[in-house]
Curated annotation (Swiss-Prot):
Domain named Ferritin-like diiron: residues: 11-160
Source organism phylogeny: Eukaryota, Metazoa, Chordata, Craniata, Vertebrata
GO biological process: immune response; intracellular iron ion homeostasis; iron ion transport; negative regulation of cell population proliferation; negative regulation of ferroptosis; negative regulation of fibroblast proliferation
Residues that bind Fe cation 1: 28, 63, 66
Family membership: Belongs to the ferritin family.
Keywords: Acetylation, Cytoplasm, Cytoplasmic vesicle, Iron, Iron storage, Lysosome, Metal-binding, Neurodegeneration, Oxidoreductase, Phosphoprotein
Gene Ontology cellular component annotations, sorted alphabetically: autolysosome; autophagosome; cytoplasm; cytosol; extracellular exosome; extracellular region; ferritin complex; ficolin-1-rich granule lumen
InterPro entries from the UniProt entry: Ferritin, Ferritin-like, Ferritin-like_diiron, Ferritin-like_SF, Ferritin_CS, Ferritin_DPS_dom
Residues with PTM Phosphoserine: 179, 183
Residue sites binding Fe cation 2 per the record: 63, 108, 142
Site keyed Essential for association with cargo receptor NCOA4: positions: 23
The protein's name: Ferritin heavy chain
Tissues in which the UniProt entry reports expression: Expressed in the liver.
Species in which this protein is naturally found: Homo sapiens
Task performed by this protein: Stores iron in a soluble, non-toxic, readily available form. Important for iron homeostasis. Has ferroxidase activity. Iron is taken up in the ferrous form and deposited as ferric hydroxides after oxidation. Also plays a role in delivery of iron to cells. Mediates iron uptake in capsule cells of the developing kidney. Delivery to lysosomes is mediated by the cargo receptor NCOA4 for autophagic degradation and release of iron.
Length: 183
């Protein structure tokens, strides 16, 4: 049986940064869990918006990959991973595509704020490696995700969602369906 030992690779890696990385891992896994819930809500037979389901499933996988990237960083820097319980999503019935997109936008802004705070901590602790990692792998991607979700919310509202079921059907078919061709 081995006990947790101090790392031989740890250098210029503050305990506060290590703890903040563990919190960010939990937040990324929570976001993945929320998106997974959204995906399977839209996959239900009484909702049947398959491209919303695909879109949110893709987002779930992205968030899980973000968590895994942070876990890899934690090990590379000589930190220790301490996983916490993942909070359940705030709701099970996402009501509409518009509501889900609004919730996703709020979630991404929270994730982004947490990353900005992590970057500030890394700056305060004089950790250029962590700053570079966050800038390279997260910040620009977050801004793009927030913009995309904001655009989706705007377009759904312009189309008359959620009052118009046809709006969400057309958005599912023509906007989210077309995104398959861009990937």
């Amino acid at each position: 049986m081995t006990t947790a030992s101090t790392s031989q690779v740890r250098q210029n890696y503050h305990q506060d940064s290590e703890a903040a990385i563990n919190r960010q891992i939990n937040l990324e896994l929570y976001a993945s869990y929320v998106y997974l819930s959204m995906s399977y809500y839209f996959d239900r037979d009484d909702v049947a918006l398959k491209n919303f389901a695909k879109y949110f499933l893709h987002q779930s996988h992205e968030e899980r990959e973000h968590a895994e990237k942070l876990m890899k960083l934690q090990n590379q820097r000589g930190g220790r991973i301490f996983l916490q319980d993942i909070k359940k999503p705030d709701c099970d019935d996402w009501e509409s595509g518009l509501n889900a997109m609004e919730c996703a936008l709020h979630l991404e802004k929270n994730v982004n704020q947490s990353l900005l705070e992590l970057h500030k901590l890394a700056t305060d602790k004089n950790d250029p490696h962590l700053c570079d990692f966050i800038e390279t792998h997260y910040l620009n991607e977050q801004v793009k995700a927030i913009k995309e979700l904001g655009d989706h919310v705007t377009n759904l509202r312009k189309m008359g969602a959620p009052e118009s079921g046809l709006a969400e059907y057309l958005f599912d078919k023509h906007t989210l369906g077309d995104s398959d061709n861009e990937s």
